[in-house]
Amino acid sequence: MIQSQTYLNVADNSGARKIMCIRVLGGSQRQYATIGDVIIAVVKDSVPNMALKRSEVVRAVVVRTRKGLRRDNGMTIRFDDNAAVVINKEGNPRGTRVFGPVARELRDRNFTKIVSLAPEVL
């Protein structure tokens, strides 16, 4: 579960290393984001000489969470870290590569470009 002030690793090569969630999109009173949800975040750590700089406000989709995600078949999937992929207004990733595994639920949320770039889909 991702909420405001949560730090996330960035799982792509957009130039950001760490982001901090400042808003969960999808309703006025929405508190938590899970895998596949879009958040608004601020870049807290970045790679030098890249497109994204510190203190830049970006949109991102959550691809991994430490909190378990329960599937319809009863299986629970849980990752080692909280991670997100930076996206643009249309929902396409800003980077050209995605690092680490992503959940299959992203395909249901129409983030097929992120799923196709990922090395492993769980």
From Swiss-Prot:
Subcellular location: Plastid, Chloroplast
GO molecular function: large ribosomal subunit rRNA binding; structural constituent of ribosome
Gene3D superfamilies associated with the record: Ribosomal protein L14
Keyword terms, alphabetized: Chloroplast, Plastid, Ribonucleoprotein, Ribosomal protein, RNA-binding, rRNA-binding
Short name of any one Pfam family annotated for the protein: Ribosomal_L14
Function: Binds to 23S rRNA.
Family, similarity comment: Belongs to the universal ribosomal protein uL14 family.
InterPro entries: Ribosomal_uL14, Ribosomal_uL14_bac-type, Ribosomal_uL14_CS, Ribosomal_uL14_sf
Record protein name field: Large ribosomal subunit protein uL14c
Transferase is among the record's keywords: no
A biological-process GO annotation: translation
Signal peptide (from-to): none
Record carries keyword Lipid metabolism: no
Record organism: Chlorokybus atmophyticus
GO CC annotations, alphabetized: chloroplast; cytosolic large ribosomal subunit
Oligomeric form and interacting partners: Part of the 50S ribosomal subunit.
SUPFAM superfamilies: Ribosomal protein L14
Primary location recorded for the protein, binned into one broad class: plastid
